[in-house]
Amino acid sequence: MEAPEEDFTGRVWFGPLAPPVHDAALNTLAVMFSPGARTAWHRHVEGQVLYVAHGNGIVANETGDRVEVAAGDTVIIPPGEVHWHGATPDAHMMHLSLTTGGPTEWMGRKVNEQDYAG
């Protein structure tokens, strides 16, 4: 399904890797970003693991740490860290997202062009 506009910039699609299980502790998603697309600022109570399955992307946090990622890379985002992730301007990116501890907490603000450009 297409991701909601209020939490993303650009075209993003996502879907579960497995059917939801009542009271499941693990949330698994496949997320596909079009070139330049990205999440808004958000955090996960118990952190997040991203595995890049295809393309090139960026993962950054509020303190200015930023890493460019490519297919085969894994990124571990610490619990509670406010961050964003998405595709580079010239490539699609698909990652697998693994989280526990409940839903994503959106910060209510999108990543501006200056933060996106680094």
Question: What residue ranges belong to the model's regions?
Answer:
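Conserved hydrophobic/aromatic positions in well-ordered beta-strands
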Residues: 29-31, 50, 96
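A short beta-strand-loop-beta hairpin characteristic of the jelly-roll/cupin
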Residues: 38, 43-71, 81
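Ligand-binding loop in jelly-roll beta-barrel domains
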Residues: 22, 58, 66, 70-71, ...
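A generic structural signal for short beta-strands and their flanking turns/coil linkers
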Residues: 10-13, 24-29, 46-48, 55, ...
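A short, N-terminal "cap"/entry segment at the start of jelly-roll beta-barrel domains
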Residues: 1-26, 105-118
